[in-house]
Amino acid sequence: MNLDFIKDRIVAVPDFPKPGIVFRDITPLLADPQGLKMTAKAMAEELKSKGIKPTVIAGTESRGFIFGVALAEVLGLGFVPVRKPGKLPRETYKVSYQLEYGSDSLEIHKDAFKPTDKVLVVDDLLATGGTAKATVQLIEKTQASVAGLIFVIELEDLNGRKVLEGHNVSALVKY
């Protein structure tokens, strides 16, 4: 698939949210009537080319929900949300991770997956890899396995892929 359609709809916004940062804005991609569908299809093609065959999709709050549900629909799979703390009503596993300034946490229902599940993690952006690594750790707590991780965008200079060594990592667009 030609990824120019996707790349052309990601807008670089300099100095946001602070000076020196180039923010990659996906809202034009989502606003395009074909944007989400084309992105999900491109993700499905990438998985197929790598022989990755998940049994369920996990999307990380919040933009991972958007792309994760779309990909789950294309692949005919279920979707499990990975949430910020306090958003899930039943018993959860929780993993904390470091941010540039401070820390954050993610949660997942303890019964979100079966031990036989092969979970694909979906999110919009791979930067430092902290959020993705925490998501992997949550999945592993459920005894399921991680089939791979796929992102719309990867910021290569932040080395997030290195944090995820040992896992199948894909990104559609790299900067």
From Swiss-Prot:
It is found in: Cytoplasm. GO terms for molecular function: adenine binding; adenine phosphoribosyltransferase activity; AMP binding. Its EC number is 2.4.2.7. Keywords: Cytoplasm, Glycosyltransferase, Purine salvage, Transferase. SUPFAM superfamilies: PRTase-like. It catalyses: AMP + diphosphate = 5-phospho-alpha-D-ribose 1-diphosphate + adenine. Its main location: cytoplasm. The keyword Cytoplasm applies. GO terms for biological process: adenine salvage; AMP salvage; purine ribonucleoside salvage. Signal peptide: none annotated. GO terms for cellular component: cytoplasm. Pathway: Purine metabolism; AMP biosynthesis via salvage pathway; AMP from adenine: step 1/1. PROSITE patterns: PUR_PYR_PR_TRANSFER (PS00103). Belongs to the purine/pyrimidine phosphoribosyltransferase family. Homodimer. This is Adenine phosphoribosyltransferase. The lineage of its organism: Bacteria, Pseudomonadati, Pseudomonadota, Gammaproteobacteria, Thiotrichales. The gene is apt.
